[in-house]
Amino acid sequence: MLHIKMTISTLLIALIVLLIIILVVFLYHKKQQPPKKVCKVDKDCGSGEHCVRGTCSSLSCLDAVKMDKRDVKMDSKISSCKFTPNFYHFTDTAAEQEFGKTWHSIKITPSPGESHTSQEICERYCLWGTDDCTGWEYFGDEKDGTCNVYTNPYLALKYTKDHVLYLPRNHKYA
């Protein structure tokens, strides 16, 4: 009987030592990971990092979109995008309009003396408007085209040749 008690107490001590080792390793590992830097714009982050959902990240543009725009659905043919200060920029992409989606179509024809491109005019329209602008799309050439300003937060992106689509970064609908 005495032999069984010693074995149980030995197992109990071994279990306690094992739990202490696991706790020390966990705390050491957690201490080694640098805290995520809080940001509002890309300039707040280090080289090669971008501000995604309020923290600096080295995610690719497509991965950042998937993290920032949780409800966005993307066509598998969309293989890249790029960061701009206020938007995720896609080329050869269009927003698929399903039932219930809303947008405003604006014909853009800059005057000859205008210093801004048609795409810059679309971007400014989206930024100047309310927070309801969830993205914009431009199709046309440099002289004449159409700007669709989206006001519904649930977009589905499909591959379409010669379309340019921008989704706001760090937006309230993310």
UniProtKB/Swiss-Prot annotation:
Transmembrane stretches, start-end: 8-28
GO cellular component: a single term: membrane
Keyword presence, Transmembrane helix: yes
Keywords: Early protein, Host cell membrane, Host membrane, Membrane, Transmembrane, Transmembrane helix, Virion
Residues forming coiled coils: none
Bilayer topology: Single-pass membrane protein
Subcellular location: Virion membrane; Host cell membrane
Regulation: induction: Expressed in the late phase of the viral replicative cycle.
Name of this protein: Inner membrane protein p22
Originating species: African swine fever virus (isolate Pig/Kenya/KEN-50/1950)
